[in-house]
């Protein structure tokens, strides 16, 4: 059997110990549970409400007690063998003798969900709805239908009878209320009760339970930020846990934390404000349809809340915040300069009574200068090992001085250049953006320094203004877009005299010589996806050509685990959502998960994992925020790079997505993200750049949306001049599935593969008219073949 056999023959080849499968294995489930426990964030713990003392009697409330949301919908959904909900987790703790569960409340919800579930649309009914939706042009009505359809797939919160609450209070010591939210690809959330805000039924439940019980714990089971104001300061709510979406073991991991088997060490990857309206872009996100004006510019998330006057008071829980069951002490903090880097060190000591982990966060403050800067920007971070009481660990952090440079897109100092402005740069080290101490060392420049000269790329032409650090706005130049495109050099090689198969590339023939054997029609077919891949593949494949024995590369979703159709009968591991993983601040753990997920793809004869996803949490209502890591590009980029390293250690290609500015789902195929070059460089592209430079992803997926008037999949400036020429990306670029742009324009831009299907007739016409050349096609084909060689190693 040749080395490409796994792409041609589809039986699962177990990769585990003793011939066992790793896909959906107990070992992977345990890893998922461990990760979930490390990323859940303890937001409140008054009077040491948690962990529960052994023998505590608990009563469980909220329909999410049994209808636990393991992850979001769409490409991020995962078919797994089971999902352990909150009730399951506490029954396990009861079996272990740690708590006593008052079962009637949980059984009430179990029966309610069962009965209400009968009214949930069947698969056939949902398919009819999608047929109707797909036939419509995008409009608000279509958006509402999609939203209502997803909402109908989960039951509403139940009204718990007062009598049952009273009975529970008489038989339990503490109440645990779990509130859940679901979101999905294709539609955004809404700033309404039952979504971003609590519903009246949820408020009533909290009111009645907190009156009946002396103490209450609230667990939030959501992939993105929800409003916490209704209960944050309620004195009867002793503890709050943001549990995110914890994958197939999320309920068990929640019980682990509440019962003290795991000490929470998650820290927020997003700011949680006092209301949705606290976001600078709140109304613009709700009303924008054909375009979104990114007038908040670089002031996204904590960069806005910690900088702009009056915004700080709008924060409930700051970026990087999270509590522990123990206390930590920082000592011996040092900061200085060495070999073009800022270096810092600190010793962290556990001064509490139980083992725990702490996150050390290093921020810098740059001089405002002519360009204006956020008050704080995350520069580096590290997480300690599990420290026993009294144990210490010394951590070293560093980052390049050039990382503090700002992009001057208007020429205030040097146009289209990264600039370090003169003045004093200070450094702040601590456990959240607000819980820091200013270090003694300052990096001082007497003159402005040009770090790197670039060029104007993806320039906005219709964004009229942007926010400044003092809360005012500056006008931006407008005009007509100018789109650049280049030419691809012809491959200098000759085809062999006789046909040579792909198996011999690198042995008897070079890759360039091999490509010269392709006919034009074969080149055209090769740069488009196809859906006839056998086996468990359900998102199609690309590449593959029987005549020359080139194997296809089967693809698979998605960011929260290998997504296979239930009809395959192959349950996989549902990992915690990306936001939870970012809240671990543990890149080693994320890399371990990437490797485990990559092994599941390899075992099932797949080649490309359409993950991880890495767009910025600009607004909490984006329907796919659960797929993305953070509001901060450094944290997102480091998490993404770790995931990619893990995935590709298994010889599976990671496909980092969605490149770029895919920050909303409504009208996602045609919505234009109007954003300044500076915000693009410093916020929305920064995480991708970190991943490219640190992890060398083998593929990147362009997004559906437009950036400043151009679909990303046809943007030569984005895909070639910036991604390849500036960052040095060597891999292949694929479109997202069904993007609304011309295949020939994509080839010219440097987008190598059109998925899920190509447009061979359009490409052939473009070739015959001279719009594209054989050299253009060969360039993309070569990148696909180089990818194939990497995956097949």
Each predicted region: which residue ranges?
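Glycoside hydrolase catalytic-domain context in secreted enzymes
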Residues: 1-435, 451-793
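Extracellular and select intracellular beta-sandwich modules with Ser/Thr-enriched
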Residues: 436-441
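Short beta-strand edge segments in extracellular beta-sheet folds
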Residues: 442-452
